[in-house]
Amino acid sequence: MSQQLSSNEICEEQGKLVKALCEAAQGGFKHDLYEKIIAIEIEVEKKLLNRLKSIQTNTFERPDIIWSCCHYKIIQHFRSRFREIHPRHVVEKKKTKKVFFKFLKTCAIFYQTCISELISKFQLDSYRPFFCKWTSSATVSSTISNDEMSSIPEASYSRNHMEALECVYNCFIYLGDMARYSSTCLKKRGAYDRALGFYDLAHRTLPGNGMHRNQIAVVWASDECIVESIYWFSSALCSEDPPKSALLNLLKQLIAFYRRCFAVHFEFVSPMMILLFIISDCCIHSLKEIQPFKCPSIMVKDLENSLLQSNIRNVGYEKKNLYYISSAFSNLLHCRYFNCNDRLRSFYYRFSSWLFHQTLACAKEVESERAPTSYLTSCLPSIKVILARVLESSPAFGFIERNELEQLSYHFRICEKFFKESSENKMLNLFEDYNEFGLCKSFICLFKRLNEDIIGPKLNINPPDYTTHPFSESIKRFYQISKILNLLLS
């Protein structure tokens, strides 16, 4: 209802904006017309900010509706204009870029102001402590005084506070999108990094949502990083609120990769690319788009067998890609679109079993000191797949025997002697991080039932000072996973 009220108030300006954009699309660069468009946009922003500043904490009207009714329309216009301008018309392109940059700057100021206002008015830093750092470092400060702050009641999980969090989340997404558009249209260096930074803030605001994951994947896809983009699109699909565009984006990436494999006659430079190709073939083999490029089924079967007979410690197994691809594989099986794919599920069982025994072998060799500690970085990615499968079939544990799981837990406990102890106590919140570990929703529901806690259980972990260790991220995951295994077997 609140969105409707705000929409009615800006309806007149929206009509003016659409008319001005239509006029701008009909001819070349018109400075006065673009100034009029930006003036309309600023007027809409002022109205929404005034409403935001005047509301009480027991009511809420969302200022982020301006994205769909105003900002996105203008961005789409500029993107089409850049495509239409002839390469020889350098002056027109330069003028259009200048106006577009001015527009993006006003948008960024608006969203930064909205975030600061919402954090202060609704005391959102009591939900997300990192907001304190945002309000102290944001380029636009809040206009709420200390007296007003002291009269605001202590934050609680009310509907209005949650709507405010969602609004802040959307503002971070839009700031990231504008940084991304700035990079693609204006060729500005570092804009992709800024976009990823805003998407990370969105993740820390509402980690269960999927839109920021989809946008991160779009950044990687723009940079032609196929493995990373597929991982993030799959992560978006199995989030609590998967965006509609994530599935289409994922299929586009899989089709593009499949065609690339066809172009090189299905000759692969590493086992990881074989794995990604098999997953792609399972997911899109029936789509008409790939029929002219389709690999014979007997060749796919040979590739599967060669992959599952290889050793995870070979040079061709890039640890980073193993993490991304095995995680994406796990995520896909928990997406509604793919969970009925029998061929994909069948290969997933075989791959998971192979990955489990490879992990167990790595842990044994590290324990017996026949292999360096760095081997742990080879086996850690597989834990994500193993845990997802084990927890999905809990309490029967499915295809992994309990005694095998106990062996893995035992060897991991033995391996702890290779790392320094630390008195610092870290917390792992599974409810917020389950997507990062590839844990399915049924796992969260199980823990909600067992613990009767809407937030989910927090596990104490005592890792070493991994900030200075050469394998810092792997060690951090190692300790987190060890605690999860111990919890499973307790």
From Swiss-Prot:
Q: How does it assemble?
A: Interacts with trt1.
The name under which this protein is listed is: Telomere elongation protein est1
Q: Which Gene3D superfamilies match?
A: Tetratricopeptide repeat domain (1.25.40.10)
Entry keyword set: Chromosome, DNA-binding, Nucleus, Telomere
The UniProt record lists the keyword Kinase: no
Q: What are the GO BP annotations of this UniProt entry? A: telomere maintenance via telomerase; telomere-telomerase complex assembly
Please name the gene that encodes this protein.
est1
Enumerate the GO terms in the molecular function aspect: enzyme activator activity; single-stranded telomeric DNA binding; telomerase RNA binding
Please report the organism this UniProt entry assigns to the protein: Schizosaccharomyces pombe (strain 972 / ATCC 24843)
Pfam families assigned to the protein according to its UniProt record, in alphabetical order: EST1, EST1_DNA_bind
